[in-house]
Amino acid sequence: MTPEQTKRFKYWQTRTIIATMVGYALFYFVRKNFSLAMPGLEADLGISKTSLGIFLTLNGVVYGLSRFVNGILADRMNARWYMAIGLALCALANFAFGFGEDVSYWITGQHDGSQFTNTMILFMGIMWVINGMLQGTGFPPCARLLTHWIPPTELATKMSVWNTSHSIGAGLVVILCGYIMGTVGMNMTADPDAVAVSYTHLTLPTN
Protein backbone atom coordinates (compact mmCIF):
# COMPACT_ATOMS: atom_id res chain seq x y z
CA MET A 1 0.00 0.00 0.00
CA THR A 2 1.05 3.58 -0.60
CA PRO A 3 1.64 5.83 2.44
CA GLU A 4 -1.73 7.50 1.79
CA GLN A 5 -3.51 4.14 1.61
CA THR A 6 -1.77 2.99 4.79
CA LYS A 7 -2.83 6.17 6.58
CA ARG A 8 -6.41 5.76 5.44
CA PHE A 9 -6.45 2.09 6.41
CA LYS A 10 -5.17 2.89 9.90
CA TYR A 11 -7.85 5.56 10.26
CA TRP A 12 -10.66 3.14 9.43
CA GLN A 13 -9.09 0.40 11.52
CA THR A 14 -8.97 2.65 14.59
CA ARG A 15 -12.48 3.91 13.94
CA THR A 16 -13.77 0.36 13.62
CA ILE A 17 -12.17 -0.75 16.89
CA ILE A 18 -13.49 2.25 18.83
CA ALA A 19 -16.96 2.16 17.27
CA THR A 20 -17.44 -1.55 17.89
CA MET A 21 -16.09 -1.22 21.44
CA VAL A 22 -18.61 1.50 22.25
CA GLY A 23 -21.41 -0.33 20.46
CA TYR A 24 -20.77 -3.63 22.23
CA ALA A 25 -20.40 -1.91 25.60
CA LEU A 26 -23.86 -0.43 25.06
CA PHE A 27 -25.33 -3.91 24.66
CA TYR A 28 -24.57 -4.28 28.37
CA PHE A 29 -26.78 -1.26 29.06
CA VAL A 30 -29.77 -3.18 27.71
CA ARG A 31 -28.86 -6.54 29.22
CA LYS A 32 -27.34 -6.11 32.69
CA ASN A 33 -29.85 -3.46 33.78
CA PHE A 34 -32.33 -6.24 34.57
CA SER A 35 -30.12 -7.78 37.26
CA LEU A 36 -29.83 -4.41 38.96
CA ALA A 37 -33.59 -3.83 38.79
CA MET A 38 -34.53 -7.24 40.23
CA PRO A 39 -34.84 -6.11 43.88
CA GLY A 40 -37.10 -3.26 42.80
CA LEU A 41 -39.18 -5.50 40.54
CA GLU A 42 -39.78 -7.82 43.46
CA ALA A 43 -40.49 -5.10 46.03
CA ASP A 44 -42.50 -2.65 43.91
CA LEU A 45 -44.32 -4.93 41.48
CA GLY A 46 -44.60 -8.10 43.52
CA ILE A 47 -42.81 -10.28 40.97
CA SER A 48 -41.57 -13.40 42.75
CA LYS A 49 -37.97 -14.58 42.83
CA THR A 50 -39.11 -17.66 40.93
CA SER A 51 -40.49 -15.57 38.06
CA LEU A 52 -37.36 -13.41 37.99
CA GLY A 53 -35.23 -16.55 37.90
CA ILE A 54 -37.26 -17.88 34.98
CA PHE A 55 -36.74 -14.55 33.18
CA LEU A 56 -32.98 -14.83 33.61
CA THR A 57 -32.82 -18.51 32.66
CA LEU A 58 -34.86 -18.16 29.48
CA ASN A 59 -32.98 -15.01 28.53
CA GLY A 60 -29.65 -16.79 28.94
CA VAL A 61 -30.70 -19.86 26.95
CA VAL A 62 -32.15 -17.80 24.11
CA TYR A 63 -29.10 -15.51 24.13
CA GLY A 64 -26.76 -18.47 23.71
CA LEU A 65 -28.75 -19.88 20.81
CA SER A 66 -29.09 -16.43 19.30
CA ARG A 67 -25.33 -15.89 19.16
CA PHE A 68 -24.98 -19.07 17.12
CA VAL A 69 -27.79 -18.18 14.71
CA ASN A 70 -26.74 -14.55 14.39
CA GLY A 71 -23.17 -15.61 13.72
CA ILE A 72 -24.40 -17.37 10.59
CA LEU A 73 -26.62 -14.46 9.56
CA ALA A 74 -24.00 -11.76 10.22
CA ASP A 75 -21.65 -13.42 7.72
CA ARG A 76 -24.25 -12.89 5.02
CA MET A 77 -25.35 -9.34 5.81
CA ASN A 78 -24.01 -5.81 6.20
CA ALA A 79 -22.26 -6.01 9.57
CA ARG A 80 -22.52 -2.31 10.46
CA TRP A 81 -26.29 -2.21 9.94
CA TYR A 82 -26.77 -5.61 11.54
CA MET A 83 -25.21 -4.44 14.79
CA ALA A 84 -26.90 -1.03 14.79
CA ILE A 85 -30.37 -2.43 14.11
CA GLY A 86 -29.87 -5.18 16.70
CA LEU A 87 -28.88 -2.63 19.35
CA ALA A 88 -31.86 -0.42 18.51
CA LEU A 89 -34.26 -3.37 18.75
CA CYS A 90 -32.76 -4.40 22.11
CA ALA A 91 -33.39 -0.88 23.36
CA LEU A 92 -36.99 -1.01 22.14
CA ALA A 93 -37.52 -4.36 23.90
CA ASN A 94 -36.20 -2.79 27.11
CA PHE A 95 -38.46 0.21 26.61
CA ALA A 96 -41.49 -2.06 26.17
CA PHE A 97 -40.45 -4.05 29.25
CA GLY A 98 -40.74 -0.88 31.31
CA PHE A 99 -44.39 -0.53 30.29
CA GLY A 100 -45.40 -3.91 31.72
CA GLU A 101 -47.81 -2.38 34.23
CA ASP A 102 -49.50 -0.20 31.61
CA VAL A 103 -49.87 -3.05 29.11
CA SER A 104 -51.35 -5.28 31.79
CA TYR A 105 -53.88 -2.57 32.66
CA TRP A 106 -54.82 -2.10 28.99
CA ILE A 107 -55.39 -5.85 28.63
CA THR A 108 -57.12 -6.62 31.94
CA GLY A 109 -58.67 -3.27 32.85
CA GLN A 110 -57.35 -3.77 36.38
CA HIS A 111 -54.67 -2.05 38.45
CA ASP A 112 -54.05 -4.97 40.78
CA GLY A 113 -55.08 -8.54 41.50
CA SER A 114 -53.78 -11.89 40.30
CA GLN A 115 -54.94 -11.43 36.70
CA PHE A 116 -53.21 -8.06 36.49
CA THR A 117 -50.00 -9.40 38.02
CA ASN A 118 -49.91 -12.57 35.90
CA THR A 119 -50.51 -10.63 32.69
CA MET A 120 -47.79 -8.14 33.61
CA ILE A 121 -45.32 -10.92 34.39
CA LEU A 122 -46.13 -12.72 31.14
CA PHE A 123 -45.66 -9.57 29.05
CA MET A 124 -42.42 -8.58 30.78
CA GLY A 125 -41.11 -12.13 30.48
CA ILE A 126 -41.83 -12.19 26.74
CA MET A 127 -40.07 -8.84 26.29
CA TRP A 128 -37.02 -10.08 28.18
CA VAL A 129 -36.82 -13.28 26.13
CA ILE A 130 -37.08 -11.19 22.95
CA ASN A 131 -34.29 -9.01 24.31
CA GLY A 132 -32.16 -12.12 24.84
CA MET A 133 -32.77 -13.16 21.25
CA LEU A 134 -31.73 -9.72 19.98
CA GLN A 135 -28.64 -9.58 22.22
CA GLY A 136 -27.07 -12.17 19.92
CA THR A 137 -26.73 -9.49 17.24
CA GLY A 138 -23.92 -7.83 19.21
CA PHE A 139 -20.75 -9.89 18.97
CA PRO A 140 -20.98 -11.62 15.55
CA PRO A 141 -20.87 -8.41 13.46
CA CYS A 142 -18.08 -7.10 15.70
CA ALA A 143 -16.04 -10.24 15.04
CA ARG A 144 -16.61 -9.90 11.32
CA LEU A 145 -15.61 -6.23 11.21
CA LEU A 146 -12.57 -6.66 13.43
CA THR A 147 -11.14 -9.60 11.51
CA HIS A 148 -11.72 -7.65 8.29
CA TRP A 149 -9.82 -4.55 9.45
CA ILE A 150 -7.12 -6.07 11.69
CA PRO A 151 -4.39 -8.19 10.07
CA PRO A 152 -3.51 -11.54 11.72
CA THR A 153 -0.18 -10.19 13.02
CA GLU A 154 -2.02 -7.57 15.12
CA LEU A 155 -5.23 -9.44 15.89
CA ALA A 156 -4.44 -10.83 19.37
CA THR A 157 -3.12 -7.51 20.69
CA LYS A 158 -5.93 -5.37 19.36
CA MET A 159 -8.62 -7.88 20.27
CA SER A 160 -7.27 -7.75 23.84
CA VAL A 161 -7.85 -4.01 23.79
CA TRP A 162 -11.29 -4.48 22.25
CA ASN A 163 -12.28 -7.01 24.92
CA THR A 164 -12.17 -4.27 27.54
CA SER A 165 -15.56 -3.24 26.12
CA HIS A 166 -17.08 -6.03 28.26
CA SER A 167 -15.74 -4.53 31.48
CA ILE A 168 -16.45 -0.96 30.41
CA GLY A 169 -20.07 -1.72 29.58
CA ALA A 170 -20.67 -3.79 32.71
CA GLY A 171 -19.07 -1.17 34.94
CA LEU A 172 -20.87 1.83 33.48
CA VAL A 173 -24.31 0.21 33.58
CA VAL A 174 -23.87 -0.53 37.30
CA ILE A 175 -23.03 3.12 37.96
CA LEU A 176 -25.83 4.49 35.77
CA CYS A 177 -28.57 2.14 36.97
CA GLY A 178 -27.48 2.53 40.57
CA TYR A 179 -27.79 6.29 40.23
CA ILE A 180 -31.17 6.05 38.48
CA MET A 181 -32.61 3.68 41.08
CA GLY A 182 -31.34 5.88 43.88
CA THR A 183 -32.87 9.05 42.47
CA VAL A 184 -36.00 8.24 40.45
CA GLY A 185 -36.74 4.62 41.26
CA MET A 186 -36.89 1.19 39.65
CA ASN A 187 -39.27 2.16 36.84
CA MET A 188 -36.55 4.19 35.16
CA THR A 189 -33.90 1.45 35.05
CA ALA A 190 -34.82 0.73 31.44
CA ASP A 191 -33.67 4.24 30.51
CA PRO A 192 -30.16 3.15 29.45
CA ASP A 193 -31.99 2.11 26.28
CA ALA A 194 -32.08 5.79 25.35
CA VAL A 195 -28.28 5.83 25.33
CA ALA A 196 -28.23 2.72 23.17
CA VAL A 197 -30.71 4.11 20.65
CA SER A 198 -28.79 7.36 20.33
CA TYR A 199 -25.66 5.43 19.32
CA THR A 200 -27.21 3.37 16.54
CA HIS A 201 -26.88 6.22 14.03
CA LEU A 202 -23.08 5.88 14.11
CA THR A 203 -21.69 5.10 10.66
CA LEU A 204 -19.33 2.14 10.76
CA PRO A 205 -17.08 1.32 7.80
CA THR A 206 -18.56 -0.86 5.08
CA ASN A 207 -17.96 -4.62 5.09
Q: Which residue stretches match the model-derived regions?
A:
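Extracytoplasmic
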Residues: 16-39
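Residue-level signature of mid-helix packing/kink "hotspots" within the transmembrane helices
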Residues: 32, 60-68, 171
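Conserved small/polar residues in nucleotide/adenosyl-binding loops
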Residues: 200-206
